[in-house]
Amino acid sequence: EELRALAEVEEELNERWPETKIEPSLERIEMLMDLLGHPERSFDVIHIAGTNGKSSTARMVDSLLRAFHRRVGLVTSPHLQRVTERIGIDGQPIHPRDYVRIWHEIKPFVEMVDAQSDVPMSKFEVLVGLSYAAFADAPVDVAVVEVGLGGRWDATNVVNADVSVITPVGLDHTDYLGDTLAEIAGEKAGIIKPREDADDPLTPNENIVVIAEQDPEAMRVILQQAVDVEAGVARSGSEFAALESRIAVGGQQVNIQGLGGLYEDIFLPLHGEHQAKNAAVALAAVEAFFGASAGHPLDVATVRNGFAQAISPGRLERVRTSPTTFIDAAHNPHGAKALGAALDRDFDFARLIGVLSIFADKDATGI
């Protein structure tokens, strides 16, 4: 009964603009948030943009925050099997019953926005609204929010984040975001904003942006945005770094230089050196969120526990043995290169067969 109701809601939402069709405006989602009483202001936010590594980084941040006994909401996209995967609460997908209930609660307000807009709300905009309403309903302490596409005009960007994260920027979605790394980085950096309550003596006077390793062209644009809005900056390779990654059964052992100090012998149940780098970014984001600084690290045992529980479905995920079978969501050359390097480093297959399915708008030759 619950799954049938979920399917009916999904069918209803599929009649809206598809997620790949975006308009450079936050007007509709802002109107919905206003009508709902601003649920997006009821929790702290770590906001994550970038081309590759967003979902894995978001899931690691989520796992770390829960290890520190925070109630966490998680927004990721797209889903692999069921739409409820996109909205996580306390480490679990939202229950279909709650998904359907909250949709029916916000539906009249969505229809009010539709009536006042030139075009109706897109499916993605509605899902973002549903996510933020679900987090306020739960309620959660902090939301880890993965950008859907770009950053500046992404519907998730109605939040004012405590910590913004930019994972590696590469060429993807060039028809929407621009043809150069600088243009794409400019769109991603749109999530870096000045702190709304900077004059409040009880809050930090700046937001923090955590930046993964970047091509110099992209890094210049991201840093300029941080300077323009007076955000604090933590860069991979400067303020923090993945120092060492050793192959281990079921994943890898990682040493990370964090913002607060050295975190050694961390077991990460994910494969590939790129995931060690994602882990360093995730840890820096959580350190920034809690205010860790040089000489004042987070509790190492809790950090180890958080990373040990991390999962990232569809990212070099082993789904069977005999024969060993992995699935991976790489869909651009940068992601495919990381996948190839991980297979080469972490495994020793005598024979490897790749089965690829690539959308027409992707760089199939590069992949």
Where are these regions (language model features)?
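N-terminal leader/targeting and accessory segments in enzymes
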Residues: E1-N52, S56-R71, L80-Q81, P139, ...
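ATP-dependent carboxylate-amine ligase catalytic core
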Residues: T20-I22, L26, E30-R41, A67-V159, ...
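Nucleotide phosphate-binding/pyrophosphate-handling subdomain across enzymes
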Residues: V142-V147, D154-V165, V169-H173, E183, ...
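Aromatic/hydrophobic pocket-lining residues that form π-stacking "cages" and hydrophobic walls in ligand
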Residues: V61, S131, I222
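Active-site catalytic microenvironments for nucleophilic, acid-base chemistry
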Residues: L35, L64-F68, A134, A285-A292, ...
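Short catalytic-loop micro-motif centered on adjacent basic/acidic residues
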Residues: D118-S122, V209-A212, F326-I327, I353-V355
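Cofactor-binding loop segments of dinucleotide-utilizing enzymes, especially the Rossmann-like FAD-
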Residues: S77, Q214, L356-A360
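Acidic, Mg2+-coordinating active-site environments of NTP-dependent enzymes
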Residues: V113-A115, P139-E146, A161-D265, A279, ...
